[in-house]
Amino acid sequence: MPARMSALPVDERGYPVPWFVHWSDGKPDFRIMDNVKRAVAVTQRKCWLCGGQLGRFQAFVIGPMCAINRVTQEPPSHKDCAIYAAMACPFLARPHAKRREAGLPENIAPDNGIALLHNPGVCLVWIARSFFCYSVPTPDNPRGWLIKVGDPVETLWYAEGRPANRLEVLEAISRGLPILTEAAKLQGREAELELAKAIDQVRRILPPPLDGVPDPDLVTVGEGGTNALKS
């Protein structure tokens, strides 16, 4: 555990409680982010996980679909805090783990944007120098907003608490890509072309190829035909 996270409170199981976690009746609910702290994190440049001051670089813990659209709900963290979360968080580290929805407070606002509720099986620590926030109002959450991450200076893929290999990442992308593809189709040809471009950019940050293991084809609509996410 990073030293800067050692001052965090722990729950009854002994797990450190990240700074962003919502507390109810004196107990942390790891499923819910504190929306006040979410705003403080971006306006005061606080680490999403430890609450300390961020420096020049920001590390986002995101899933493979967020790597494609470069959009996330969660503010950035220190690099070492983000890596610890990617390796130690039960939901992120265990591909078959599921979020518990039972008993969620009724006053919790729905997530902004298109939520991908499945566990992708891999996560990515996306390290950048910049990000910006933009408004995403919905009928249920008129003050909703999301974060667009800047170009990465470093990317680190993880699965099962260790560095992920290329095939694991590609398989995770294949599970979520149909959702983005259908959303792009509804928005029209320009959105489909933008998606193809975004997928091509993700290809450049995949883990290295595995000896003797070909990449699976991940095809989306592109200008003049189709584009496959392959090396």
Q: Model regions: which residues?
A:
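Eukaryote-specific, cytoplasm-facing alpha-helical/coiled-coil scaffolding segments in long proteins
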Residues: 101-110
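Cys/His-rich metal-chelating microdomains
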Residues: 50-53, 84
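Short cysteine-rich clusters marking metal-coordination/redox-active sites
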Residues: 47-51, 78
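Short linker/helix segments within small regulatory modules
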Residues: 63-75
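Short metal-coordination and nucleic-acid-contact micro-motifs, chiefly zinc-binding Cys/His arrays
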Residues: 40-44, 71-74
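Short, non-ligating residues that shape and space the ligands of small metal-coordination modules
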Residues: 54-60, 87
